[in-house]
């Protein structure tokens, strides 16, 4: 185990609004550099809660457990400090930010990210046009990454996610990932709401970004995304804990049989949907998190 591994130990998480109702009930998981781990599970099993807890979402409280990342106790860090440690979260439901152009948003995000790596008191990360990445370098970088994701360059002048289709929103999430080059990427149901063509383009973009220095936690409900992105390990999350792990064959088994046989083997038939409270805060709290990319 190295400092570049994400190490989750006995993690228990509950909603702030109902701290006695734990959604995650003892998650143990290690994601190493260059590894892709897929988290699959029925609705309400705690998949999104895991993603949000790792990034410090204010709607959730860690009741016990530990998370180590880059040699630090992640749970003691603020959201912005987690992001500056090269962690990235792609949302399942990206929010619109009227009045903020994609170009300004991306440049501010890049500046904040680079300041996290190399602090410079003369640069204001909240100002996209003062200091930070030179405009020429920024334009070249964004054009290169847009081409990778087959995005129209005109999207840079539009307001963030305002009037975007589902596919455009997901591609913008991937564009953020591409320009920021995180060392740990958490992709929360990136395949949801995508038709087969958009799914293929997004998956090809993710594959092009995979590298030996980046770990990926890929959260998905369906096996179809794994037809394009090959995971090193597949985990089944149900009733707030990982009940089974395996290779890609496990995802194929889930596609063929569904979750019921595995849940039944664990005596969890009645647990399907038990964790539904995790879904409640998703849309309400996302705008504040969007800047944490």
Name each model-derived stretch:
Residues 2-8, 12-28, 32-38, 57-62, ...:
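A short, flexible loop at the N-terminus of ABC-type nucleotide-binding domains that lies
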Residues 66-82, 161:
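ABC ATPase NBD Q-loop/coupling interface
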Residues 95-183:
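ABC-family P-loop ATPase nucleotide-binding domains
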Residues 186-190, 197:
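Walker B catalytic motif
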Residues 199-212:
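Helical segment within the ABC ATPase nucleotide-binding domain
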Residues 213-221:
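Conserved H-loop
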Residues 237, 241-264:
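Conserved beta-strand-loop-alpha-helix hinge in the C-terminal portion
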């Amino acid at each position: 185990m190295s400092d570049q591994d994400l190490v989750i130990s006995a993690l228990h998480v509950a909603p702030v609004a109902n701290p006695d109702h734990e959604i995650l009930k003892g998650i143990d998981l290690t994601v190493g550099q260059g590894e892709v781990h897929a988290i699959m599970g029925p609705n309400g099993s705690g998949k999104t809660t895991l993603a949000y807890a790792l990034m410090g979402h204010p709607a959730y409280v860690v009741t016990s457990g530990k998370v180590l990342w880059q040699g630090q106790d992640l749970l003691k860090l603020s959201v912005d400090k987690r992001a500056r440690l090269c962690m990235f979260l792609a949302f399942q439901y990206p929010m619109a930010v009227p009045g903020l152009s994609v170009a300004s948003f991306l440049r501010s995000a890049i500046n904040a990210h680079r300041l996290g790596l190399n602090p410079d008191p003369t640069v204001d990360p909240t100002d996209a046009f003062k200091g930070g990445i030179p405009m020429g370098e920024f334009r070249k970088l964004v054009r290169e990454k847009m081409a990778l994701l087959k995005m129209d360059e005109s999207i840079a002048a539009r307001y963030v996610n305002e009037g975007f289709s589902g596919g455009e929103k997901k591609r913008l999430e991937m564009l953020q990932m591409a320009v920021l080059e995180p060392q740990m990427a958490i992709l929360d149901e990136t395949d949801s709401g995508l038709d087969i063509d958009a799914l293929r383009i997004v998956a090809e973009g993710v594959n092009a970004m995979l590298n030996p220095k980046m770990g990926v936690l890929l959260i998905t409900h369906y096996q179809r995304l794994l037809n394009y992105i090959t995971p090193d390990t597949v985990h089944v999350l149900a009733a707030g804990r990982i009940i089974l792990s395996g290779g890609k064959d496990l995802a194929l088994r889930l596609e063929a049989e569904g979750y019921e046989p595995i849940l039944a083997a664990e005596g969890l038939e009645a647990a399907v949907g038990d964790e539904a409270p995790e879904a409640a805060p998703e849309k309400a709290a996302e705008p504040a998190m969007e800047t944490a990319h």
